[in-house]
Amino acid sequence: MEHEVVSALAAFTQRYVACWQQEKGHLPASEALYGIPSPCIVENHEDTVYWSPQPFAPSVALDGVERALEISLHPDVHAFYTAQYAGDMAAQFDSLSCQLLQVWSEEDFTRMQENLIGHLLTQKRLKLTPTLFLATTDSEMTMVSLCNVSGEIVLEAFGTKKRQHLAPTLAAFLSGLNPLAV
C-alpha cells in the first residue's frame, strides 16, 4: 500500500507541475514560501520562489509522532509525508477545493510532526477516532484527513465527529485529484 501512495503522490505531483507549466509557463511558484530555505528551490525572483519536488531524506520518518503519543500511525501517512519535499499543492477533488499539504524542508518536517501531535492530542481529549490531516480546505473548520484506523480519506469538521467519506484509500484520493495552478 505504501508503494501505491508514493506512486500516486508522484503522479499527482507530475500533473501539478505540468499544469503550472502549461497554464503559467513556469514551475510552481509561491510568495508564501519566499525566503524559507528548502531543497526544492530552483529560483528566487522578486518576492516569489519557483520550486520543483525533491526526494525526501531517506532516514526520516514519523517515529516522533508515534513515540510522543504511543500510537502506531497508518503506513499510508508515513509514505505520504516522507516521499518528497515540495510546496503545498492546490487541487480539486470532485467539487472540493483543497491544498494538499507537503513538507518543504527538514525544519518543516519537524513543525508538521508537532502539528500532527497537537491534532491527535486534541482528538484524544475529545474522545474522537484519530485522524491525520493531509489537506486544508477553503473553510478553516474542515480538513481532509486519513482515518488512522481504517485508512479511508474523510472530510472532517475540526473537533467534531462529523466526517464525510471521500475515498477508500489515500492512493485513490491522490489519483482522483485534479491540479490547480493558483
From Swiss-Prot:
Query: Can you supply one Gene Ontology CC term for this chain's record?
Result: cytoplasmic side of plasma membrane
Membrane topology is:
Peripheral membrane protein
Alphabetic keyword roster: Cell inner membrane, Cell membrane, Membrane
> Any keyword Transcription regulation?
no
Gene3D superfamilies linked: Syd protein
State the function annotated in the UniProt record: Interacts with the SecY protein in vivo. May bind preferentially to an uncomplexed state of SecY, thus functioning either as a chelating agent for excess SecY in the cell or as a regulatory factor that negatively controls the translocase function.
Name the record gives this protein: Protein Syd
What is the gene name? syd
